[in-house]
Amino acid sequence: MPLRPGRCYRHFSGPAYTRKEYIPGIPQPKITKFTSGNPNGDYDYEVRLITTEIGQIRHNALEAVRTLTLKTLSKKTGSETSFFMWILKYPHHVLRENKMMAFAGADRLQDGMRLSFGTPIGTAARIEKLGETLIVIKVKKEHLEFAKEALKIASKKLPLRTRIEIIPLRLVRQEVQS
């Protein structure tokens, strides 16, 4: 059975379905690495991707965002040590699907809406408040435009609307030192 479009799982109602010890057969999330780059670098700016909607983001969308952002930043900056990227959301919520057959004679083979709880098909990260941060990228001043461009491209892979926020780190350090 093919993967349903992301719009089928964008909105949610009810509590999160997260108790993995009681749910058999949950597929592993595609996203496994949540940090990349050099965490100990001396950076000037922090660029954040912030959600402006409430909803769910599937694990494969998070992985697509991570790989696209990492590839764009590595290519533009020249190395993977000139930035630090951190994905803050983890896909805890288990998604279920009641598979329906759509061919001639399917009504004899399936149960319809009887026993329609569904089987686990994947996981999703829930965005439950407006303004939650999805991705943080720390860069030097010369790579600021590359980070903004990478997050702008990556936001197209997400089912929710987002905005980019830039926070200077140098000003904060200078105020603390004086």
From Swiss-Prot:
Superkingdom of the organism of origin: Archaea
Transmembrane segments: none
MF term (GO), any: structural constituent of ribosome
Keywords tagged on the record: Ribonucleoprotein, Ribosomal protein
Coiled coil: none
Pfam family, one: Ribosomal_L16
Family, similarity comment: Belongs to the universal ribosomal protein uL16 family.
Protein name: Large ribosomal subunit protein uL16
Protein source organism: Saccharolobus solfataricus (strain ATCC 35092 / DSM 1617 / JCM 11322 / P2)
